[in-house]
Amino acid sequence: MHVPAPLRFPLCAVVLAFIDGCSTVSAQPLQPSDYQRAERVHDSHLRGALRNASVVPNWLADGRFWYEREDARGRRQAVLVDPLQATGEVLFEPAALDSAVAPFGASGPRLRLASVQATDDGLRLRFSGEAPIDCRWPRWQCAPSQDAMPPADALLSPAGDAWLQVRDHNLWLQSPGTAARALTTGGEPGHGYGVLPDFTLRGIPRRQGRMPVRPFAVGWSPDGRYVAGIRYDERALQDYPYLESTPANSARPRVHTVKLGVLGDAQQVRDSLYIVDVRNGRQQDITLPEGWNILSEAGILGWDGGRLYAAMAHFGMPRRLRLVEIDAGSGALRTVLEESSDTRLQLNVYSYNRPAVAILPGRDTAVWFSQRDGWGHLYRVRLSDGKVMGQLTGGRWAVRDLLGVDSAGDWAYFSAGGVEGGDPYVRGLYRVPLHGGAVQRLAADGDDHLVDAGTAMLFGGRAPQALSPGGGYLVDTVSSLAQPPRTVLRASDDGREVMVLEAADAQAVVTAGWRPPRRERLLAADGRTPIFATIYLPRDYRDDGSFPVIDAMYGGSFISNAPVTYAEAVSALNPVSRASLAELGFMVVSIDARGTGGRNKAFHDSSFLRAADVQLDDHVAALRQLGERYPGIDLERVGIYGHSFGGYSAARALLRYPTFYKVGVASAGSHNFQGMYGGALHGMDRLFGGVLPATPTAEGVPAPFAGLDNAALAGNLRGHLLLVYGELDENAPPALTLQLAAALNKAQRSYDLLYLARQDHELFRNDATYTHRMWDYFVRHLAGQQPPDTVLAPLPGGPG
């Protein structure tokens, strides 16, 4: 048998073991102090430890801007910056704010700076939170606000004089001093206005009232006259059940249901557009052509007077993407341009990022992103007839993000990687004339230049803020793996530094014992394509040693996950625990292989119809190359872990390469595609291949997904595999892990299963039980050591 851990049955976790074989246990087991050292550098404990790592500017009409920061004690401050004078001034000290608001029963730490407005004699600072309070600056006089403060779940108008909320599945409009009125009618469960739909994978917390959210997929026109949004229809979808086995204050399990169309279901989410004239309440409902959907990550792209622009897509074959114009007064829809491809179509090299598209009001012009030449570049398009007036950027490199457009100066600002060669994931800053001409480098020096590019619609749809409204300045955060972030104000005409805004305080990170990783350039399995990896070395690594190696993988086609900046390396989106595992004696490697985003289209499309298979080929090739560069790596002891698509990939690694990968931890894995969500909005058929609507075969699995099901390879398992799932995970439903477990049972393969009660998809970041078991699993089965008998501290945001 495997040597089991001491039996423990905590309230929210039970380990079910199906075990055989025997692991060699080292005579020198790890100590509790080793785990404590690993804890200190865990991503969740270090989140926020890197103080003032970035600056989000809030621009005023006069060209100044303000931003928030933390002082040396972690208290919030606000700074006012005058770019013309190259000066910054703290608007308030925390102690002064405390004193000023105390007479009104408020305390500074419980207030949030909601807005700053210029007045004749200075500024008005509006605070929300414990109490609505207005403060005058520089006189620093505070008083309770006389104006109604928008609630936290409100969507404010551009002028700030009205806001939207969702009530009873409809949008309601309110202004200070006036009663709220319904702006839409006819909303109903599963087909509301501004309601967060279940396809966003947050249905359970929304139903529980734990997620007050602003109106979803809704936006104002710049002049505040119109409200436009996307209406989702989930009424025809089947109910999908989740069983909460240990609900609070009850011994009776509770069933939650959400609306979910899985791959191959005849009914999937449908969407339409609507526009409401706020002045007279006139509403236009726009039905999309059959088979077309609004591109879910794009939403509404922009406005030009009374004309709205959006991107919609059709995922038949070939796949088609359209830029469309909708007249707000009549609801008439017109196609501006159309692109097609047999694989993916998207408006950014990363589909999770905001579309690299800008509508230029009054110019009959759009800056449009396209991969039509095989890379990812910007084009100037005439809106009146869809004619491409010119390709603005070009070359064997890809635009990363469109940072803003200075219409008056006729410049488009963007970030890109690999323009001058080198690491294609390291961003530089550039601009290009709207009417054509050479690309001008503003900042590209080998360090990464992160400029706020806004967020995609699925993550709130916020517009970029880094470029000043007048186009004269950019806010740029400069960093590398070894260098903490430094945020500067940069002149947009030549890229010169105007002033330093913040130098991040990394003292808490360093004190915790965190060490920067290394960057390596490698070759893919084809022997030609450069790929890149980030490596976390054990503290005591030496070339004459023998250190096991762990492949820390995500691999989803939406992003890349090998860090290139200090902040990413300290506390990552996915995967986490890399620095922690290095402290436990493992070399930990993250690789951006073929099939992930950020590069050219062919590189990205390697995962189309193949999911993680090409990536795993590249990972094996890369690890073998690293074994030649780092003689201390023991390639007879290779492990892998991942979460979500990374969980799928980790399990698949042990099943496709059973003699190479010996130990794996797969949490919240999307182990088959037929059990995942389908459809055009963000379904597996859209992301990884096939023609919509996906039609099941006689076996119930739509082609071409049968070969991507991990269960089909269950008989190949030879190593140690720990499967992990949270019972309320809407992103990767628990059934997917249990279906793989059933296939492993049928094949009489041994594995381990960790069930986490009340947990959702965040378990890999916030669950100490998962983290503990994952570390133990690699220590016992890969390092051959006995884990210490210790308990990890709770992680921030973990389950109660």
In which residue ranges do the predicted regions lie?
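N-terminal secretory signal peptides that target proteins for export/translocation
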Residues: M1-L7
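Hydrophobic alpha-helical segments with strong N-terminal bias
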Residues: P4, Q36, V500-L501
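Beta-propeller folds
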Residues: F9, A13, S23, A27-G460, ...
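Serine-hydrolase catalytic core recognition
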Residues: G63, G305, A311, G409, ...
